[in-house]
Regions:
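Gly/Pro-rich hinge or "lid" segments in bacterial periplasmic/extracellular proteins
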Residues: 1-38, 160, 164
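Short, well-ordered beta-strand elements
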Residues: 7-10, 20-21, 36-42, 176-185, ...
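A bilobed periplasmic-binding-protein/Venus flytrap-type ligand-binding module shared by bacterial periplasmic
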Residues: 23-27, 87-110, 114, 123
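Ligand-site clamp/hinge motif
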Residues: 26-72
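Short helices/loops that flank or line small-molecule/ion binding pockets
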Residues: 48-59, 76-77, 105-106, 194-203, ...
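Ligand-binding "clamshell"
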Residues: 71-84, 224-226, 240-255
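Extracytoplasmic/peripheral linker and loop segments enriched in polar/acidic and small residues
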Residues: 106, 121-122, 155-157, 206-223, ...
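Structural transition elements
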Residues: 130-168, 186-191
């Protein structure tokens, strides 16, 4: 079949796992103002490899996540080439709502409270991100969000409340909760998963086993619901809250947290 598009470019070549080549479309309505004639996209899983190929001149531009250990160094060495811009995206860990014991709201809430977002954002990643208290970014156009009470608590108070909830759910220091944390192959995702597992252990005594999968297998695992907690991320298709909220509808193909709420659906 033929792919039908209405953008400034058309598909010229596609080699799976190697490259996607787009060329300027002469039938695009604003073709006179299209500046670039051809664009080649390269799928690069490693952020370090991405940077190395950029600095060698092989890549003209990258919008990938910067390697944690190289970001500050690159900002000093090539400040005019490293840009940090606001993004309507949320990086998060999704909890399998249908799999015991994660179908217990106390367990899910404890994991939420026990994650020190300030350390992840400001110490581990340190690339200008904002700590998130919800799925939809507060600067989304039209969003009128109320910051939850717990977001104003100290991390110590969050940890105390999380431990109480875990104890109510049957998990203590003698019988700790053990979870599998799934992430797809990436230098950044691995480092963040290691940090997250360390924080959950230190803050609320949860044992975390890291599970790495390649992208296709990772997606299948999430859709099938055979995971505990998984790395996830979502970027808005358009600047409006429903771009985030619609993914949590029970019939959404993007609802890999397997969240179900008749009230939310209605």
């Amino acid at each position: 079949g033929n792919i039908v598009t209405n953008g400034a470019y058309t598909l010229k070549d596609w080699v799976v796992n190697e490259r996607i080549v787009l060329e300027r479309s002469p039938t695009y309505w604003n073709n006179a103002k299209t500046v670039i004639n051809q664009v080649t996209y390269l799928p690069i899983a490693s952020e370090v490899t991405d940077v190395n190929r950029y600095r060698s001149g092989e890549i003209d531009m990258t919008y990938n996540n910067m390697p944690i250990e190289l970001f500050q160094k690159l900002k000093k060495e090539i400040p005019d080439e490293v840009h940090v811009d606001p993004y309507l995206c949320t990086y998060y860990y999704e909890i399998n709502n249908q799999k015991p014991p994660f179908n217990d709201v106390r367990v899910r809430t404890a994991l939420k409270l026990g994650m020190d977002r300030d350390i992840i954002v400001n110490k581990v990643k340190a690339q200008g991100d904002m700590p998130a208290y919800g799925y939809t970014p507060p600067y989304t156009d039209g969003a009128k969000l109320t910051q939850p009470e717990w977001f104003g608590w100290s991390q110590e108070k969050r940890n105390e409340e999380a431990k109480k909830l875990l104890a109510e759910a049957g998990y203590t220091a003698d019988k700790p909760l053990t979870i599998n944390l799934l992430y797809n192959t990436s230098d950044l995702h691995k480092k963040l998963a290691i940090a997250a597992s360390s924080l959950w252990k230190k803050n609320i005594g949860v044992n975390v086993k890291l599970v790495n999968q390649e992208w296709k297998t990772f997606l299948d695992t999430r859709h099938q619901g055979t995971f505990d907690v998984a790395r996830a991320g979502w970027c808005a298709d358009y600047n409006e809250p429903t771009s985030f909220l619609n993914t949590m509808l029970s019939n959404s193909s993007m609802n890999t947290a397997h969240y179900k709420s008749p009230a939310f659906d209605s």
